[in-house]
A protein has these predicted regions:
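The feature marks proteins involved in alpha-glucan
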Residues: 15, 21-44, 49, 64-143, ...
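Tight coil/turn sites that cap or link beta-strands
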Residues: 540, 581-586
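Bacterial N-terminal signal peptides
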Residues: 8-17
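Hydrophobic faces of well-ordered beta-strands that scaffold small-molecule active sites
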Residues: 140-144, 177, 225-227, 299, ...
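Substrate-binding/active-site clefts of carbohydrate-active enzymes
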Residues: 109-112, 128-136, 145-298, 303-333
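Conserved, mostly hydrophobic/aromatic
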Residues: 47, 144, 169, 179, ...
Length: 652
């Protein structure tokens, strides 16, 4: 025997063959799961391919030679333990001699590349594990698109770059960020509603560790994270799940999808087959991954209508799937918030709330109507008081102002010729902030608070220069959000969904008055300013102004009509008071003023040409460490020169 020739051939055989295959893995889990136990270290590979004649795995750990998996005795799964495999190595399954990304792959190179073994246990969550769930009555949601939120040089922003703005979000006062879909999609830019890999996090946004760092940073700053999930359709492009194990019927998608007319959606024939237990479990496992591995605090389910209906025909399978997943959440993670985009309550499938599109369309029209005569105060009264916390109320979202839907931002729709002008600012500020005083859970879309008027697009970065140009508008949002969440400790009226009394509706003058607990709201939806408008207050005596959207501190062009914050009006013995109301403005009153030592101002960006000193005021309740972090973030974000000597002075 020629030993010199035999040894190289033997080495080549072992490299191609990889580790010896067990009959099947005795370890649990689907996909690629690193293990370190009494049996050693390595990775378990398991995939569902009931109709396949052969399944193998190949990757960097085999020199890209194929190693066969063993078909398990039940369930249509194939598995193997490979001691040579490690986290961070690329791999693919080989199903009937066809290379496939892992449908359960937790990380990918990209939507057309390889899967990557990922170890969830390697991430250090630190003290963020102590984060407490946000109570429903304390939720103020900020919808964010990770790719556009902090993008520069036409590159999509990563979750790490989004995390650089958490100090801003904390100062703004929001209590939750709702991320548009984060799963892998084709290319580097997308809204995210075309997922290709349902367990992997979009690589262009930084992948799984970057998302975890974002969630960790949010939790460390008291902000919850919700995730938008898409299960009404997948893809339709870059879907390695398509005809995954070789079986399909009628040219449809095989085991993961319906294989008849029920597969058809507006986005392709890629509706998951909710009638299969394995597909329902696949979806539930994704939700479980987000909660237990990424520590997310809630979900918004996209287009629930197209889960519960197929081409307009009722689909009980979809309702069964939603009930299964939501019931699992209720029993295992009851604090995780469950929101549907639509049709949450056609029957009980376990959702707590849904997006209120009627609020959007009705309230938005108050701003966009061509004349004051078209603004209906009865509609406003209804929208402010109905529904409670089972609805998420908003005036802008990705759908309402995005390029894919050929929509525009509210300021543009108000005045397309001058979206940065007086009328656009007045009406947009008034109408956008009505969500913050309603009985529902308010949501703001990224940029609304800085009067962004460019159409939302995954190709258009949010213009952070607007936080300087429209610093007063940002401050108006912050003031109202802090009032909503009772940050000053003087009133929790806006946290009670059942205390709404719209007691004054004047359709002729376009003025509405509302009582919520100990608060009085006066809302003027007309271009007419009033100097002595009579409004009934809950009781006589002195009432303090907590908010006035017409103040020139919010915009120098505003009318400055009515009292400043802390100013007073006096209700007479009949509990009526004459109010000075600016055009398209809102005022809020209470008999309990904002404590002087608890008031806060919010400068959202360094002013142009700032001098030798800049004052940053923060909430004393946040504590000195939070204040120091805020100062540090301001200095770092704005790259102030000569800011090495920062002096902080505490008062109150």
């Amino acid at each position: 025997m020629n030993i010199r020739r035999a040894f190289p051939l033997l080495s080549l055989f072992l490299l191609l063959r990889g580790d010896p295959a067990e009959a099947q893995s005795t370890r649990s889990g689907m996909g690629a799961i690193p293990y370190a136990d009494a049996g050693g270290t390595g990775v378990t590979f398991r995939t569902w391919a009931p109709n396949a004649s052969s399944v193998a795995v190949k990757g960097q750990f085999t020199g890209w030679g194929s190693t066969a998996l063993t078909k398990e005795s039940s369930g249509g799964t194939w598995s193997i333990d490979l001691a040579s495999a490690r986290a961070g190595q690329e791999y693919k399954f080989v199903v009937n001699a066809s290379d496939r990304r892992d449908p359960r792959g937790q990380r990918v190179v990209n939507s057309a590349g390889n899967s990557i073994v990922y170890d969830h246990g390697s991430f250090d969550w630190g003290s963020s594990t102590n984060f407490s769930a946000i109570w429903r009555n304390d939720l103020v949601i900020y919808e964010m698109h990770a790719g556009s939120y902090n993008a520069e040089d036409w590159l999509p922003s990563t979750f790490d770059e989004c995390a650089d703005k958490i100090a801003y979000l904390k100062a703004l006062g929001v209590s939750a960020v709702e991320l548009m879909p984060v799963n892998e999609f084709p290319g580097d830019r997308s809204w995210g509603y075309n997922p290709s890999d349902l367990f992997a996090i979009e690589a262009s946004h930084g992948g799984p560790d970057a998302l975890k760092r974002f969630v960790k940073a949010c939790h460390e700053n008291g902000i919850a994270v919700l995730v938008d999930v898409v299960h009404n359709h997948y893809g339709p492009s870059d879907l390695d799940m398509w005809q995954y194990d070789g079986w399909s019927s009628g040219g449809f998608g095989g085991i993961h999808f319906y294989n008849d007319w029920k597969a058809n959606t507006d986005w392709g024939a890629t509706r998951p087959d909710y009638g299969r237990a394995e597909v329902r479990d696949f979806i539930q496992a994704q939700i479980q991954m987000f909660v237990e591995d990424y520590h997310v605090d809630g979900f918004r389910w996209d287009s629930v209508y197209n889960i519960r209906n197929c081409s307009g025909t009722w689909n009980q399978n979809g309702s069964d799937m939603l009930w299964q997943v939501n019931d699992w959440l209720k029993n295992n993670h009851p604090d995780v918030y469950r929101i549907a985009e639509d049709h949450a309550f056609d029957t009980d499938v376990g959702f707590e709330a849904q997006w209120d599109h009627d609020f959007l369309s009705n309230i938005r029209y108050l701003a966009t109507a061509g004349s004051d005569a078209d603004r209906n105060m009865d509609t406003l009264a209804y929208c402010l008081g109905s529904g409670g916390f089972n609805r998420v109320v908003y005036v802008e979202s990705h759908d309402s102002c995005g390029d894919l839907n050929k929509k525009h931002r509210l300021p543009y729709d108000v005045d397309s010729g001058n979206p940065e002008g007086y009328w656009a600012k007045k009406r947009a500020l008034l109408v956008n902030t009505l969500a913050l005083i309603s009985s529902g859970i308010p949501m703001i879309f990224e940029g609304s608070e800085m009067h962004e008027w460019y159409t939302f697009s995954n190709n258009q970065a949010l213009r952070w220069s607007l936080t300087n140009e429209n610093a007063g508008i940002v401050r108006a949002y912050a003031d109202l959000i802090h009032l909503r969440r009772n940050a000053y400790g003087n009133t929790d009226a806006l946290k009670d969904p059942g205390n709404v009394d719209v007691h004054h509706v004047n359709n002729a003058a376009k003025v509405v008055g509302m009582k919520r607990g100990d608060l009085l709201f006066a809302i003027n939806c007309s271009a007419t300013a009033f100097t002595g408008y009579s409004m009934a207050f809950p009781s006589s005596g002195t009432w303090y102004c907590l908010y006035n959207s017409d103040l020139q501190s919010y915009d120098s062009a505003f009318g400055n009509i009515g009292p400043a914050i802390g100013g007073t009006v006096v209700a007479d013995g009949s509990a009526n008071a004459p109010l000075a109301l600016g055009a398209y403005s809102m005022q809020i009153y209470s008999q309990t003023p904002i404590p002087e030592d608890s008031s806060a101002s919010f400068d959202p960006a360094a002013p142009d040409g700032c001098g030798s000193s800049v004052t940053i005021t923060y909430m004393p309740g946040d504590g000195p460490l939070a204040a120091a972090a805020t100062v540090y973030a301001y200095v770092g974000r704005n790259d102030w020169q000569g800011a090495s000597n920062v002096q902080m002075t505490a008062s109150g």
